[in-house]
């Protein structure tokens, strides 16, 4: 009898639906911090960023009723629950309630570690919402996914932060994102393929490791509750300058690297969490080896250092950074997408 019930529920094994979404991580070059509503609603904001070919994958399907739990989640740990309210992961719990999801199995995997300064949590939020809509058989465009990921993280999960990560993960590509009191707009950077390729080749990324900086960062963050409006306004003006460097062929691309160095120094002046001694030492090593400038992407649980390096200096920078993992990457334009979609005949009972 049991076998008949099962075959009735799933006419064929391939009728069990599975969705896999693929969502890129982002690197932000200029304007970080001006994407906070507390700043841009009064002053306007803008960010220059790109997504690149490192992704997170969210696999979602309905969970067959063979188990004494109705939802199974697999990320850095495994959760098995019968009630959505019992889910520990805030983003998954709130997203499931928000979109009225029940009886699912969700698996998260990523090319790079979480909490490492690449907007990983927002890429996950966007990819998860994309997968949930696909599971429901509904289409959600990039703006809807970005807006709802912002709402999920900032309102439902009450996590502090800006808006740029969710927008970048959703839309993909090399963009200028403008923020006003009325919302945001995503404007692709008009740069020739050759120049974009050259920029990509001149950027080198290194992983600094996980926990070295977290206590320094927490102390600095606690002590750093000062007004940064003037600094953020200067960061905002740099977005215009950086965009001009990228789009104007008469300007050397090396200016982009020098501007990264300028921003680094600007951030240092505020005594922000960026200026931990270990990272300063690594940054200075890179500059001494020939990098024109660089940027720490994130801090806390870990981080990535990106340097702008002319081709003839790259081997020297690799040697100077030999203690760190080097991560080659390419820019990408796709944003979040569904890469596997199997329709199903199974209906959850809830």
Feature roles, as predicted:
Residues 1-17:
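Short, Lys/Arg-enriched N-terminal segments with co-localized hydrophobic residues
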Residues 13-30, 35-37, 41, 47-49, ...:
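C-terminal nucleotide
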Residues 103:
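Core catalytic loop region at the nicotinamide-binding pocket of NAD(P)H-dependent oxidoreductases
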Residues 106-114:
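N-terminal pre-triad scaffold of radical SAM enzymes
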Residues 116, 295:
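Short aromatic-hydrophobic micro-motifs that form the base-stacking/packing surface
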Residues 118-138, 142, 170:
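DPxDG-like acidic metal-binding loop motif
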Residues 302:
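Glycine-rich active-site/cofactor-binding loop and its immediate structural neighborhood
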């Amino acid at each position: 009898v049991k076998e008949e019930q099962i075959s009735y529920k799933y006419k064929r094994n391939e009728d069990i639906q599975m969705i896999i979404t693929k969502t890129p991580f982002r690197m932000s070059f200029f304007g970080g911090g001006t994407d906070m509503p507390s700043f841009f609603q009064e002053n306007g904001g803008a960010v220059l960023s790109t997504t690149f070919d490192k992704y997170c994958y969210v696999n979602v399907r309905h969970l067959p009723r063979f188990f004494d739990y109705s939802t199974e989640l697999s990320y850095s740990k495994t959760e098995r629950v019968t009630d959505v309210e019992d889910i520990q992961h805030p983003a998954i719990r709130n997203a499931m309630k928000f979109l009225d999801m029940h009886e699912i199995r969700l698996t998260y995997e990523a090319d790079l570690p979480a909490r490492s300064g690449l907007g990983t949590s927002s890429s996950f939020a966007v990819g998860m919402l994309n997968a949930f809509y696909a599971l429901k058989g509904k289409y959600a465009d990039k703006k809807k996914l970005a807006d709802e990921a912002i709402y999920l993280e900032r309102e439902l999960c009450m996590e502090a932060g800006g808006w740029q990560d969710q927008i970048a993960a959703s839309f993909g590509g090399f963009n200028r994102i403008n923020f006003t009191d009325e919302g945001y707009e995503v404007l692709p950077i008009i740069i020739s393929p050759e120049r974009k390729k050259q920029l990509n080749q001149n950027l080198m990324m290194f992983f600094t490791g996980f926990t070295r900086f977290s206590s320094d960062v927490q102390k600095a963050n606690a002590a750093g509750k000062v007004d940064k409006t003037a600094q953020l306004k200067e960061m905002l003006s740099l977005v215009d300058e950086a965009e001009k460097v990228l789009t104007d062929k008469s300007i050397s691309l090396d200016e982009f690297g020098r501007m990264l160095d300028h921003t680094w120094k600007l951030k240092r002046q505020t005594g922000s969490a960026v200026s931990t001694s270990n990272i300063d030492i690594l940054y200075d090593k890179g500059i001494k080896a020939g990098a024109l400038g660089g940027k720490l992407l994130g801090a806390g649980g870990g981080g990535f250092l990106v340097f702008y390096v002319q081709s003839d200096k790259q081997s020297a920078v690799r040697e100077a950074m030999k203690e760190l993992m080097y991560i080659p990457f390419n820019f990408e334009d796709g944003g979040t997408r569904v890469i596997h979609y199997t329709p199903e005949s199974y209906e959850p009972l809830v």
